[in-house]
């Protein structure tokens, strides 16, 4: 769902 996408984006930002 939309929240899952948000969590994925947060994960990508955290890896930067």
Swiss-Prot record:
Q: Where in the cell is it found?
A: Secreted
PTM Leucine amide: list the residues: 16
Keywords recorded for this protein, A-Z: Amidation, Amphibian defense peptide, Antibiotic, Antimicrobial, Secreted
Question: Which GO terms are recorded in the biological process aspect for this UniProt protein?
Answer: defense response to bacterium
Q: Where is this protein primarily located?
A: secreted
Q: Extract one GO cellular component term from the record.
A: extracellular region
The protein's superkingdom reads Eukaryota
Q: In which tissues is it expressed?
A: Expressed by the skin dorsal glands.
Protein name per its UniProtKB record: Aurein-2.6
**Per the similarity annotation, which family is this?**
Belongs to the frog skin active peptide (FSAP) family. Aurein subfamily.
Q: Does the keyword Ligase apply?
A: no
* Function recorded in the entry: Antimicrobial activity against B.cereus, L.lactis, L.innocua, M.luteus, S.aureus, and S.epidermidis. Probably acts by disturbing membrane functions with its amphipathic structure. Shows anticancer activity.
InterPro entries membership: Aurein_antimicrobial_peptide (IPR013157)
């Amino acid at each position: 769902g939309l929240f899952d996408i948000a969590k994925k984006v947060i994960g990508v930002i955290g890896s930067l």
